[in-house]
Amino acid sequence: MTDINNKNNNSDHSITVIEDEASIIKTLMVTRGDLEKELESLMNFLKSGDGKTFGLKGSFTDSEGYPSPHLELIIEVKKARSRIAHIQNDYKQVMKDIEFHLEKLHKSPTNKNQSSSTFSINNTTSTSNNNNNNNEDEMKIDKPLTVETETKPKPIEVEVEKVGIPFVYIDLVSEGSPSDKANLKKGDLIFQFGTVGPFFEERQVGDNLNSNHLQSIATIVRNSENKAIQIKLSRGTSIISTSLIPRKWSGQGLIGCLIKPI
């Protein structure tokens, strides 16, 4: 009797493991589908929507090297490119998780005798016939779920450099100013100014927030006279890091440029 009880307990444990793994895999598959849909939407925006002007890797400058005047569109394209990079990383991790849990499922004792490449778990409770006075709980493995293990989906490879979301831009640079010497140009999109930024989530930027970020930049400039401030920005398809040293010069202010919130 003890052996029978032990076998039943082991069977129940195996069934629980299968149920847990099946639930995890279902959730991961839904996540993978959501990522694929979002990626498709972003790629459509960059390839055939408003973003096709610049596309996935297009330059934000014209043939003569001048920045494009379409600043609002540039911001949206930058956001799309940044989000695609995040999706790529998330997608790779989800695929690793799916592979891990599928392997764990296939190693479970109850599943070793199953040769199908798809699986499903359905809980059913059946009552014995009139010739049997005992009730039994039966676990049936029948109609398979559409989780294929024979072929693994390939990760989506999109080469996009990860950068922060720009929150201010350079609208004017005075010749001979500290900003000019720091190689700042009109149209530069700044995503880090000293301790402000970088930001990688849209909830961290926006109309009101960007105005607050601009005020923080003004404070940093006032408190950094003759001290280097690290700035990171995007110009066309290039990511540039430079040092700006606020100081007194022949013009107005300490940096000689006009910075506006996006």
UniProtKB/Swiss-Prot annotation:
UniProt protein name: Probable 26S proteasome non-ATPase regulatory subunit 9
UniProt KW Translocase keyword: no
Gene3D superfamilies: 2.30.42.10, 6.10.140.1710
InterPro entries (alphabetical): Nas2_N (IPR040815), PDZ_sf (IPR036034), PSMD9 (IPR035269)
Record GO biological process: proteasome regulatory particle assembly
Region called Disordered, residue ranges: 106-142
Pfam families, alphabetized: Nas2_N
Listed Low complexity bias regions: 113-134
Key word Protease present: no
Keywords: Chaperone
Gene: psmD9
Family listed: Belongs to the proteasome subunit p27 family.
GO cellular component: a single term: nucleus
Role this protein plays: Acts as a chaperone during the assembly of the 26S proteasome, specifically of the base subcomplex of the 19S regulatory complex (RC).
Species name: Dictyostelium discoideum
Top-level taxon in the UniProt lineage: Eukaryota
